[in-house]
C-alpha cells in the first residue's frame, strides 16, 4: 500500500454525523427484531479494542452502534495519553474496562452474545480482521457463529469506507450518540493510494488518536453492503404506484 495523500476522513461531515444521533433507548427500539452484522477490531491487548453492529432499517437508513474494551489497569494511563475520559465513558456504558492489565476477550464474546439476545436482533455474520483475531474467530465459529474474515486491503475496504461517509452526508445513518465512536471517527485519517482507493488510518502508528470503533464499523459494513435491502416504500405509496415501480 503506497499512500499518495492523507487527510481527515470525516472532514466536513462531523457536524452531520453528530446531528444524526438519537437517544440510546430510541436507537434500540429502531433495531429490535432486525437482522444485522457485527464487526470487530482487535488491537494489542493493552489498547482499545472494539465491536460494532450495523443494521439496515426498513426506510433505507443504516443504524450504527459500537462499543469499546480496554484493560482496567491501563485505563488511567490511556486517559492521560489519549486525553479522553475512558472511565467516565465506561460508567455511561459506552465501553467496558476489563479486569487486569490486558483485555480479556471473553468480555467481547459476552458483549456480542448479550447485545444480540437483549435487543432481539439476529446477527447474520461476525466480521473480523483475520490477522489480528484468528484464534477468537475460531472460538466464535465453534460457538455456532458465522464468522467472515475481512481482508484489510484496498479492494475490500475502499468502497465501504467511501460509502459510509456518503451515507452520513446524505443523512441516511442513525446512531446512539456514542462519544467514543464519535471520537474515533474524528481521529480517522483517510489514506489514499494512486488508484483513488482509501482506507482508514491513525495519523501515526503509535498515535493516541485511536480509530478502533470506526474500523469495527467498516468491517461490519463490508458484509452489510453485500446484503443491502431495498427501502420499504409501501407505507409512503399507494398500490397503483407500487405496481408501476415494481413492474
Model-assigned labels for residue ranges:
Residues 1-37:
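ATPase catalytic-site recognition across NTP-hydrolyzing enzymes
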Residues 55-125:
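Nucleic-acid-processing active sites and adjacent nucleic-acid-binding tracks
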Residues 31-56, 62:
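Gly/Thr-rich phosphate-binding beta-strand-loop-beta motif of the actin/hexokinase/Hsp70
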Residues 120-132, 136-137:
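Short glycine-rich phosphate-binding loop at a beta-alpha junction
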Residues 82-91, 139-231:
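Metal-dependent DNA phosphodiester-chemistry modules and their immediately adjacent helices/loops
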Residues 41-45, 56, 69, 128-133, ...:
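An acidic- and aromatic-residue-enriched active-site/binding cleft used to recognize and process polar
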Residues 221-247:
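Acidic two-metal-ion nuclease catalytic site recognized across multiple nuclease folds
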Residues 9-16, 47, 99-111, 128, ...:
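Phosphate/oxyanion-binding active-site loops and adjacent basic polyanion-contact surfaces
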